[in-house]
UniProtKB/Swiss-Prot annotation:
Further comment: The 100 C-terminal amino acids are dispensable for activity.
Amino-acid positions noted as binding a divalent metal cation in the UniProt annotation, renumbered to this chain: 97, 104, 106
GO molecular function terms attached to this record: DNA binding; DNA topoisomerase type I (single strand cut, ATP-independent) activity; metal ion binding
Source species: Escherichia coli
Stretches with biased composition (Basic and acidic residues): 297-310, 496-510
Result of changing residue 106 to A: 4-fold and 3-fold reduction in the in vitro DNA-cleavage and strand-transfer activities, respectively, but no reduction in the in vivo functionality
Name of the protein in its database record: DNA relaxase MbeA
Co-factor note (free text): Divalent metal cation. Can use Mg(2+), Co(2+) or Ni(2+) with similar efficiencies, but is not active in the presence of Mn(2+).
Superkingdom: Bacteria
UniProt keyword annotations, A-Z: Cobalt, Conjugation, DNA-binding, Isomerase, Magnesium, Metal-binding, Mobility protein, Nickel, Plasmid, Topoisomerase
Subunit: Interacts with MbeB and MbeC to form the relaxosome.
Pfam families xref list: Relaxase (PF03432)
Length: 517
């Protein structure tokens, strides 16, 4: 078995998913082992980072593994590749290919940590290659698989995965010719290989310690030939077989020492990577930053052309995320969770989900709904579903049922009751939207729809209602003060009018004749 990571990762999500399963999801010999292809595709499309996904393959020379071996190898690879991360912190798609006569386990990982929205880079070759190579050695030894590092398994030709088909066909044809000349006894060393290439009409443009490069007869970039025939160590053809046998014997004798060293390298690498992941993707730290209004992970790496941390988890559950550069998928999630427009009361896409969650809450009241289920993806906390103080920035409308006139006919009690009714109705609508939407969006992002998350969502909505209720107190207090001030002003105005009318009454009084004649 050999682990390969592809250089691709900057396109949309349809590219890798369509390659693994076919455009119509009908590729022959392809089987989905784990993950949701459409979810992975949409997560990749919603990722704002320059490199959107990481992909690769575990390639086996064998056609099949022992029963349960595939699942164990896949789980072990995830733990070693992303130590310190839980299953609900990343998304991965595993697809099996059998169309080449051997087993291939292909994987695709969106480059986004789901709980913080930060950029996730599962594999960086310079830092992670030693750890992955060590894991490869351990797995091959444990299952007795074909070892590509064994001297007897060295390839006579090694080509990069992204080499065009025409160049690949030319390199393979050249190598077959060299191999035929070698077995015929006409090639005894590397110099004979160079001479044979020249006599065949090919131009040798570069010679290094491990390869020979020839010019492409059709133009374009040179073709690099790398393998046993093209290495500097291929100096004596007569002793190649004896040398290979000797190296193979030494390789087998040192197997236990090699395994111990691989175990040490793998453990140390996992410890370092685990500390880095836990520090970088700490849920508490990330949520605190999100509530404070900062963008998680923004600008943490210079090669991220897009804004980091504005797509999912922590930010999407109720925090303000603005900007026209966001993808349509994320804007849809954001608008569904936190609507900055007035609620019109029209039926929404999540009302049915809200009813389902309410029914689930009644059925499972008092029970731990996650208990007894396979904990592949742990249930999120209430804070993860509701997004913390998601209503702190929401403006609660107060216009519904509030009389606008302040004339004497509208009593203060009626206006106060109307204002309270409007505020409570607006807060209740927000609670209903959260109950219906929080579970729907989380299930859309992670593929899980557990009833416990529904209960958490309801609890969060209840807390939101309590916060909305507390906002009524200053409103009512202010209404009382305004009413009292207006009553005082009206009394003063009446008194002033009465004082102005008294002189006028006195002036109109006339002294008549005395009746005492």
């Amino acid at each position: 078995m050999i682990v390969k990571f592809h250089a691709r990762g900057k396109g949309g999500g349809s590219g890798p998913v369509d390659y693994l399963l076919g455009r119509e999801r009908n590729r022959e010999g392809a089987t989905v082992l784990q993950g949701n292809p459409e979810e992975v595709r949409e997560l990749i499309d919603a990722t704002p980072f320059a490199k959107k996904y990481t992909s690769g393959v575990l390639s086996f020379a064998e056609k099949e593994l022992p029963p349960g071996g595939r699942e164990k190898v896949m789980a072990s690879f995830e733990r070693v590749l992303m130590p310190g991360l839980e299953k609900n912190q990343y998304s991965i798609l595993w697809v099996e290919h059998q169309d080449k006569g051997r087993l291939e386990l292909n994987f695709v990982i969106p480059n986004m940590e789901l709980q913080t929205g930060k950029r996730l880079q599962p594999y960086y070759d310079r830092a992670d290659r030693p750890r992955i190579d060590a894991w490869q050695t351990l797995v091959n030894h444990h299952y007795g698989l074909h070892d590509p590092n064994a001297p007897e398994n060295r390839r006579t030709l090694t080509l990069p995965d992204n080499l065009p088909e025409t160049k690949q066909a030319l390199a393979e044809g050249v190598t077959r010719g060299i191999d035929a000349l070698y077995h015929a006894g006409e090639i005894k060393g590397r110099q004979d290989v160079i001479q044979a290439l020249t006599e065949a009409g090919l131009e040798v443009v570069r010679v290094t310690r491990t390869s020979i490069s020839i010019a492409d007869p059709n133009g374009g970039k040179n073709i690099r030939l790398k393998g046993a025939f093209y290495e500097q160590s291929f100096a004596d053809g007569r002793g190649v077989r004896e040398k290979a046998e000797r190296e193979s014997r030494i390789y087998r004798e040192n197997a236990e020492q090699r395994v111990q060293e691989a175990r040490r390298i793998c453990k140390r690498g996992c410890d370092i990577k685990r500390d880095e992941n836990q520090r970088r993707y700490s849920p508490v730290h990330s949520l605190d930053r999100g509530i404070a209004g900062k963008t998680p992970g923004r600008g943490e790496r210079g090669d991220d052309a897009a804004q980091e941390g504005r797509v999912k988890a922590g930010r999407e559950y109720g925090h303000d995320v603005t900007g026209d550069s966001l993808s349509p998928v994320y804007r849809e999630w954001r608008d569904a969770l936190v609507s900055w427009r007035e609620d019109t009361g029209e039926p929404g896409r999540n009302q049915e989900a809200g009813r389902d969650i309410a029914e689930t809450e009644r059925e499972d009241m008092g029970r731990g709904v996650c208990a007894g289920r396979e904990q592949e993806i742990p249930c999120p906390s209430v804070r993860e579903i509701s997004g913390g103080d998601s209503l702190s920035g929401e403006r609660v409308g107060t216009s519904e049922g509030v009389t606008q006139s302040d004339r004497a006919g509208n009593t203060f009690a009626e206006r106060l009751r109307a204002a309270a009714t409007g505020l409570y109705a607006a807060a209740e609508r927000m609670g209903e939207r959260l109950r219906g939407i929080a579970e729907d969006v989380f299930a859309y992002a992670t593929g899980q729809r557990d009833a416990e998350r529904a209960g958490h969502a309801v609890e969060s909505a209840g807390a939101a209602l309590e916060r909305a209720d507390r906002t009524l107190e200053p409103v009512i207090q202010r209404e009382l003060e305004i009413r009292e001030e207006r009553l005082i002003q009206e009394r003063e105005h009446v008194l002033s009018l009465e004082r102005e009318r008294q002189p006028e009454i006195q002036e109109r009084t006339l002294d008549g004749p005395s009746l005492g004649w």
